[in-house]
């Protein structure tokens, strides 16, 4: 059974330097990573540059900064840094009129107990949500979580419509994941707002094109569309074009005329 068209749901990640042009050409959305590198939040030229890059693209996601920013950090000063950077990112997203943001959950195996991760994350995100307008959506993304349970627990305990989850399918298929990608979808479905699409061979995080790896990508997309019909998607490749052609061949998007 063919997937319904993803035309109104699909975005291209800014990790492809051609993403804005491709989004316009293919009439898709864009997930900007302009501020994923936190120091750019302090660069006064970054905001006008990003505003120009996204001009004319109607469907947008904002990927928040993540390196060394850990909401569940043991040191409260480290948590304070994460809060400060995330608030800067929130301000930048609002300045760009972007209402949807992705943030990494921040779990690190063998450093944090899962129970600590959940407990501290619930506190952190409740505090952060004080500053988030009612019409914005935050989606917490899996990176090194071994299973969906911790993120699901965080979202369920916070129980706020502004906070949902982002399933990164490629991360769910690396050596740190103990759960096959297909088995993440249903548990996350009640909170699933967004999905990152990229492939690999089940070990390292390659961010390979959708048709190059052992993830059952067609089945993943169909299952998400059924279990979480409001969820959107982003292709996360350094070169998104092969994935766009793969999706077009599947009947999931339309080739540009």
Model-flagged regions — what are they?
Residues 1-88, 257:
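N-terminal pre-domain/capping segments
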Residues 1-8, 18-23, 88, 99, ...:
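Histidine-acidic metal/acid-base catalytic patches
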Residues 13-21, 34-48, 70-73, 109-113, ...:
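Acidic-and-aromatic substrate-binding clefts and catalytic sites of carbohydrate-active enzymes
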Residues 30, 63, 82, 93, ...:
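Conserved, mostly hydrophobic/aromatic
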Residues 50-67, 121-135, 217-224, 229:
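Alpha-helix-loop-beta-strand connector modules within alpha/beta enzyme cores
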Residues 72-164:
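Active-site acidic/histidine proton-transfer and metal-coordination neighborhood
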Residues 27, 59, 137, 164, ...:
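Hydrophobic "anchor" residues on beta-strands that sit immediately upstream
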């Amino acid at each position: 059974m063919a997937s319904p068209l993803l035309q109104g749901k699909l975005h291209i990640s800014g990790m492809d330097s051609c993403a804005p042009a491709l989004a316009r050409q293919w009439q898709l959305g864009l997930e900007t990573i302009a501020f994923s590198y936190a120091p750019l939040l302090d660069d006064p030229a970054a905001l006008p540059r990003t505003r120009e890059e996204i001009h004319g693209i109607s469907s947008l996601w904002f990927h928040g900064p993540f390196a060394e920013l850990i909401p569940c950090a043991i040191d409260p000063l480290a948590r304070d840094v994460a809060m400060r950077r995330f608030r800067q990112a929130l301000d930048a997203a609002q300045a760009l009129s972007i209402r949807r943001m992705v943030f990494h959950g921040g779990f690190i195996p063998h450093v944090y107990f899962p129970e600590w991760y959940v407990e501290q994350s619930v506190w952190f995100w409740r505090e952060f949500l004080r500053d988030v307008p009612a019409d914005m959506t935050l989606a917490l993304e899996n990176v090194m979580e071994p299973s969906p349970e911790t993120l699901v627990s965080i979202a369920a305990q916070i129980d706020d419509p502004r906070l949902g989850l982002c399933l990164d399918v490629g991360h769910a298929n690396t050596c740190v994941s103990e759960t096959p990608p297909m088995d993440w979808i249903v548990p996350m479905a009640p909170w699933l707002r967004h999905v990152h699409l990229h492939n690999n061979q089940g070990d390292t995080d390659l961010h390979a094109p959708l048709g190059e790896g052992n993830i059952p990508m067609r089945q993943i997309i169909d299952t998400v569309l059924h279990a979480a019909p409001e969820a959107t998607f982003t292709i996360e490749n350094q070169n998104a074009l092969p994935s766009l052609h793969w999706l077009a061949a599947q009947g999931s998007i339309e080739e540009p005329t």
